[in-house]
Amino acid sequence: KMVENVDGVGEFLEDLKKNTFQKYDAFTVGEVFNMKADELGQFIGDNGHFSTIFDFCAHSLSDGAHGWYDAPHVDFKTWRDTILSSQINVQKYGLEANIIENHDEPRGVSHYIPESDVSDTSKKMLAAVNVMLRGLPFIYQGQELGMTNVYFDKLEDYRDIESINFFTELTESGLMTPEYMMKCLMLRSRDNARTPMQWDDSKQAGFTEGEPWICLLYTSPSPRDLSTS
């Protein structure tokens, strides 16, 4: 909110564009949140601050009123209609960068596909949506393998400070039980997409010969079942 409400941010971005990116005809991608409906043309297009920006329309569907613990389930029809609306709207100005997941979001396979429907076919369909939309598909590491959430069942396995603080505050205040909060973290924690890339079925999935900063994806599919090799 501090950045959103400060006058002159647009002028600063224009100065940045003029004196850096524009000199080299550089392609730029912005990350913009809480943008008003009539502001898209200020950020992309011929006169925009950036060449394009990430489209977070689908991700905003799982924003709870108070955080993760009351985040709503992503309904398929709402998800479909939201993406379609965004695609139509952006055509007036240019194109956007389409994403399914990133380092701050849970894995798309676990987030958008009902657990009972997760399969190679449904994973490929989700990938097809991302690459066939108008715009630029951005692929996050592990997404090309169909990696899922990690589903850590112990708080000690998490490294994301937001996840740890969120769990601690809500359980110590008595607002939520530890069991409920663990389920929330399994679904929404940023650590779900921050586990090491799985290269093969060797120790540590071929990512390192040492100990990684965080556990591997140790539930099904395991590194033996899901790796680049």
Per-segment meaning from a language model:
Residues K1-S220, R224, S229:
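Active-site and adjacent substrate-binding regions of carbohydrate-active enzymes
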